[in-house]
């Protein structure tokens, strides 16, 4: 454990406290995915160092990913001009993102701040994951309902290996019978293939592609939309 406070929002945890918080937040997050605070806490307390380090190394091995690690750009209300996004042509990534935020009545700043990561490099990896999660929904054309969230979590679980994403398995068990059948026979085979063949999403500079058509972004990411 790092007893030293490494950044403004940092909350150092003793090993036992981390385990207990991880168990408690996981239990709450799985039963009530709307609890963003518990989902965030589960994500951080279960994201062990080797997992985050693997993501960091994969980013570092990619030209764009390495640049992201060096410059550490943020996606927030301060860095994103939402009025400009709203005025972009239909079909662009930026317009899709603007519509996504408006439809959910949310903002880039709605994501909880990272608190429980004890490594500054891993801090950015977790923050970047959190801030780009919405773009994964957009690139995969998945809604934010239970079916869409479970599908996205499977993608992230395979690509990133984060335990909180792997927990999407439990979310699948909570799907209604009709949606569960659709997920197992349609979404699951598709998303497994996409996660394996697509470009590593954590090494993609979404903010530099707002003016690009979503279809072109999907091609660059090697994503084939679900039919």
Swiss-Prot record:
Function: Lyase that catalyzes the C1-decarboxylation of 4-hydroxy-3-methoxy-5-(all-trans-polyprenyl)benzoic acid into 2-methoxy-6-(all-trans-polyprenyl)phenol during ubiquinone biosynthesis.
Catalytic activity reported: a 4-hydroxy-3-methoxy-5-(all-trans-polyprenyl)benzoate + H(+) = a 2-methoxy-6-(all-trans-polyprenyl)phenol + CO2
Membrane topology according to the record: Peripheral membrane protein
PANTHER family cross-referenced by the UniProt entry: UBIQUINONE BIOSYNTHESIS PROTEIN (PTHR12922), UBIQUINONE BIOSYNTHESIS PROTEIN COQ4 HOMOLOG, MITOCHONDRIAL (PTHR12922:SF7)
Chain positions recorded as Zn(2+) binding sites: 133-134, 137, 149
Domain of life: Eukaryota
Name of the protein: Ubiquinone biosynthesis protein coq-4, mitochondrial
Keywords from the UniProt entry: Lyase, Membrane, Metal-binding, Mitochondrion, Mitochondrion inner membrane, Ubiquinone biosynthesis, Zinc
Example GO biological process: ubiquinone biosynthetic process
Keyword Repressor part of the UniProt annotation: no
Pathway in which the depicted protein is active: Cofactor biosynthesis; ubiquinone biosynthesis
A GO cellular component entry from the record: mitochondrion
UniProt keyword RNA-binding present: no
Further facts: This protein may be expected to contain an N-terminal transit peptide but none has been predicted.
InterPro entries: Coq4 (IPR007715), Coq4_euk (IPR027540)
Record text on subunit structure and interactions: Component of a multi-subunit COQ enzyme complex.
Location of this chain's protein in the cell: Mitochondrion inner membrane
Organism: Caenorhabditis briggsae
Main location: mitochondrion
Family: Belongs to the COQ4 family.
